Amino acid sequence: MTRIGILSDTHGHWDDRYLKHFENCDEIWHAGDIGSWEVAERLAAFRPLRAVYGNIDGGDIRRTYPELNRFTIEGTDVLIKH
């Protein structure tokens, strides 16, 4: 079973507690308003990251992550949207 860590609306704020909170997760899913490329990079360096952009996200994040992210994991259809 895949363990998922879910968050959104970080608005460019990094908190080292994310690492502790998500340490037992296999993937992190971010539902938009990441807020800075640094936050996205740090999350992706820690665990595989699936994300979408939100209304505050700039061009760098919008070019990397879609508005909608739909995929199947372990037979379950998932849609992430901000």
Question: What is each model feature region?
Answer:
Residues 52:
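Short beta-strand/loop motif that positions the catalytic acidic residue
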Residues 1-49, 57-70, 75, 80:
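N-terminal active-site segment of His-dependent metallophosphoesterases
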